[in-house]
């Protein structure tokens, strides 16, 4: 099986199997497949119909060829494309190629989301990846793509707790018809049982509206001090999406409180360093540590000056 290159340039192997795509169907005994020969032939046929191609036309052709390869002959006017965690070049290139694209961003309580996202790498002791993940989250707060394009943020909590209100509203914004299949977990019209790698898989990971992920208490990795720093830096986002009530005076107090804390190690950093039996000075001189500190301080400086982010 051909591996897929990730954003960090590492190769990911057997993604489909790891995400449960080899155990679909009512009896979990079916495998998602694509006829490579049919896909290639259809893509070549579509390409032969054009004297010249650009990235967007080819992008649409790939989807059309895929549909034919899985025997899906429904006429479709829209493409729902999961551009998961793209790097800056890929995202801006996509915007340039398709400026009329509508962007849907799934959002979640940021500190809870942060702890969930870094969990695996934290327990692996991979500080470089952990720090980069937090940098990515902080950098997304004023991503210019979402302010300049037709974009909407959908709270995971609303989708899980109020699907009968959230899904119809999203359908209206997207210009699609609400159907029962939108309330089901499926792939190629086959029942999908969820991602086996999810920590919630055995609890309610097979339920599309399971609430374990949004009910999990924060604190298994991030201490109260860690949470204070991050929640303060996420404050404008938290207010905008209703995770906290607006309280500007408290925010200003918290900003002042965390300023000296930014130059000290987070408690989760102490834990990783202890696990790796690293030297403190060496750890604090590492590129990952310095890059993380630079991002924290730049985010703080911006909030101190404007009390919000650009978008």
Language-model features, listed with the residues they occupy:
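Charged/polar, solvent-exposed surface patches and flexible loops
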Residues: 13, 41, 64, 68, ...
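PAPS-dependent sulfotransferases, especially Golgi type II membrane carbohydrate sulfotransferases
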Residues: 176-311
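PAPS-dependent sulfotransferase catalytic domain
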Residues: 42-50, 55-183, 191-207
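PAPS-dependent sulfotransferase catalytic core
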Residues: 1-57, 305-311
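Poly-acidic low-complexity segments
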Residues: 16, 20-35, 42, 54, ...
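Preference for short coil/turn "hinge" residues that link or interrupt alpha-helices
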Residues: 8, 152-153, 215
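Short, charged N-terminal helix-start/capping segments
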Residues: 2-32, 70-99, 271, 278, ...
């Amino acid at each position: 099986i051909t591996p897929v290159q990730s954003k960090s340039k590492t190769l990911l192997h057997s993604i489909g199997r790891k995400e449960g795509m080899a155990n679909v169907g009512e009896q979990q005994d079916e495998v998602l497949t694509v006829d490579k020969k049919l896909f290639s032939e259809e893509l070549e046929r579509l390409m032969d119909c054009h004297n010249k191609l650009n990235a967007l036309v080819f992008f649409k052709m790939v989807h059309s060829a895929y549909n034919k390869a899985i025997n899906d002959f429904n006429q479709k006017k829209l493409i729902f494309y999961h551009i998961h965690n793209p790097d800056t070049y890929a995202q801006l290139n996509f915007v340039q190629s398709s400026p009329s694209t509508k962007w849907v961003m799934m959002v979640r309580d940021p500190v809870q989301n942060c702890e969930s996202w870094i969990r695996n790498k934290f327990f692996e002791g991979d500080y470089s990846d952990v720090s980069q993940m937090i940098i990515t989250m902080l950098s997304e707060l004023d991503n210019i793509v979402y302010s300049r394009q037709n974009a909407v943020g959908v709270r995971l909590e609303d989708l899980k707790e109020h699907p009968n209100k959230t899904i119809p509203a999203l359908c209206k914004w997207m210009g699609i018809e609400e159907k029962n299949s939108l309330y089901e977990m499926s792939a190629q019209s086959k029942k999908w049982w969820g991602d086996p790698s999810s920590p919630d898989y055995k609890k309610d990971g097979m339920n599309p509206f399971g609430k374990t992920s949004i009910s999990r208490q924060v604190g298994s990795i991030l201490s109260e001090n860690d949470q204070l720093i991050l929640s303060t830096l996420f404050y404008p986002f938290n207010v905008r999406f209703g995770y906290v009530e607006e309280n500007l005076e408290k925010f200003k107090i918290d900003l002042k409180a965390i300023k000296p804390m930014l130059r000290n190690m987070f408690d989760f950093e102490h834990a990783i360093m202890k696990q790796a039996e690293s030297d403190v000075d060496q750890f604090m001189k590492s590129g990952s540590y310095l890059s993380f500190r630079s991002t924290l301080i730049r985010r703080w400086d911006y909030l101190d000056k404007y009390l919000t982010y650009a978008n």
